[in-house]
């Protein structure tokens, strides 16, 4: 992890010692553990963390160590983070905007097998890269309002 890490007992200690005049990333292993436990207890489905909301290696690594087995990724950069800090975790590529090269890397380099499309052209892009296989999951999104007006 390339982010410098300094441990403080709490936020007040950080403010007293550093007096930061810049945005600071604060990470509480204890709080993340608590929140993860609450989610796991209250939801027995597949929990998937959206890397886009906070792509910190510290968070991805701890979530994986706590048993999170899937991550929602929106770019090849996010896939690299998951590969490096949550090895073996499933990745769901739900970003509707992706080009052929990104799809190729997702499938061939990062092992992504779950894709989301919201336009027929995206299915063509996916089909050009991925050979028909039973190990691929494609979720289709559409706007009901537009579909119903047609």
Language model segments and positions:
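Active-site loop/helix belt of alpha/beta enzymes
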Residues: 129-132, 144-150
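A charged N-terminal "starter" segment
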Residues: 1-136
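ATP-grasp fold ATP-binding core
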Residues: 137-143
